[in-house]
């Protein structure tokens, strides 16, 4: 949709340790500013002063894919230059937003290179918190992929983490990029089999999706024994934090804001064990992350800091 903005600059958040695309999926209008001062812009369309390149160097190639433009923009800002997205300078990207990548390369490179960026640039006093936030995020993805039987995606999560803390850069080994097995077929097959559902909270988008899967399904106005009750939550991994019952029932399913679904006894068992599994994962992996941070600060990053001065 050419009247929608894919993104208009990027912001690096060292509080939550993530990068966000500004104005993503926002309708283009006069309310959008023409100039946006930001941390980075898309490498697909940019102009860079020669002086900035002389100071900050060329765009890093070690990432192979993803996060290279983010790191370059961030480095350029560290050398005192401004990074600005211009509304009059635009290009159109022809892509299907619903297209699913055939393999796990996006998942692998986004995870590995994002981890490397924050291990490299986070302030020393924030590294302990950074390690916990990023490891939690990776483990959550891994756990959800496991629940969705996306075993290749789950293996890609762990491969990206291990390569990040081992200092692996460049193109990934062939055994790290696998076929994408995140199909969402469990969601589809579940609603294909239902005759009636009751939604505790209105969600027109979810209702439309369910009707597309099963045009004959009936949406009840009140809960009843003949209908499956749909309960919405922020995260199916955190439903215990919202006082939802954890006893399995075939007549109740949970769907979170990312449309992940909890609908089986096996899912419920995994949810009950999520927190202790997470704590064991953090205990095992956090020291390795902090060791890699120390290696970066004593190696390549120390040299870059001297260049800044």
Language-model region placement:
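Peripheral/terminal regions associated with large enzymatic or DNA-binding modules
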Residues: 1, 30-41, 45, 81-84, ...
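Short, solvent-exposed loop/turn segments at secondary-structure junctions
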Residues: 1, 53, 90-91, 97, ...
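Acidic/His-rich active-site region of diverse nucleotide-sugar glycosyltransferases
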Residues: 1-56
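Active-site-adjacent helix/loop segment of glycosyltransferases
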Residues: 36, 78-165
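A short, conserved alpha-helix in the catalytic core of glycosyltransferases
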Residues: 39-58, 62-90
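Non-catalytic, C-terminal membrane-associated alpha-helical segments of glycosyltransferases
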Residues: 126-193, 259-309
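Short, charged N-terminal beta->alpha structural module
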Residues: 192-221
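Short, well-ordered secondary-structure micro-motifs within conserved domains or adaptor modules
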Residues: 218-264
């Amino acid at each position: 949709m050419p009247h929608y903005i894919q993104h208009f600059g990027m912001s690096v958040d060292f509080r939550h340790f993530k990068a966000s695309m500004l104005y993503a999926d926002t309708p283009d209008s006069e309310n959008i500013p023409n100039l946006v001062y930001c941390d980075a812009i898309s490498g697909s369309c940019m102009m860079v002063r020669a002086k900035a390149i002389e100071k900050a160097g060329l765009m890093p190639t070690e990432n192979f894919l993803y996060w290279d433009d983010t790191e370059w923009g961030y480095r350029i800002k560290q050398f005192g230059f401004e990074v600005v997205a211009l509304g009059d300078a635009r290009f159109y990207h022809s892509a299907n937003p619903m297209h699913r990548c055939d393999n796990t390369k996006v998942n692998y490179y986004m995870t590995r290179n994002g981890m490397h960026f924050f291990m490299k640039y986070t302030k020393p006093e924030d590294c302990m918190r950074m390690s916990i936030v990023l490891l939690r995020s990776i483990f959550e993805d891994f756990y959800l992929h496991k629940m969705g039987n996306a075993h290749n995606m789950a293996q890609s999560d762990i491969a990206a983490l291990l390569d990040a803390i081992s200092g692996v850069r460049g193109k990934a080994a062939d055994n790290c990029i696998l076929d994408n097995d995140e199909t969402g077929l469990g969601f589809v097959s579940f609603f294909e089999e239902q005759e009636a559902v009751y939604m505790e909270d209105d969600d027109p988008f979810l209702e439309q999706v369910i009707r597309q899967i099963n045009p004959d399904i009936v949406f009840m106005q009140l809960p009843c024994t003949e209908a499956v009750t749909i309960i919405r939550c922020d995260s199916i991994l955190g439903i215990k934090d919202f006082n939802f019952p954890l006893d399995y029932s075939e007549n109740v399913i949970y769907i979170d804001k990312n449309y992940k679904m909890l609908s089986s006894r096996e899912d419920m068992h995994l949810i009950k064990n999520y927190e202790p599994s997470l704590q064991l994962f953090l205990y095992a992996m956090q020291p390795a992350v902090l060791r890699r941070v120390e290696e970066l600060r004593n190696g390549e990053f120390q040299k870059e800091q001297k260049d800044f001065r």
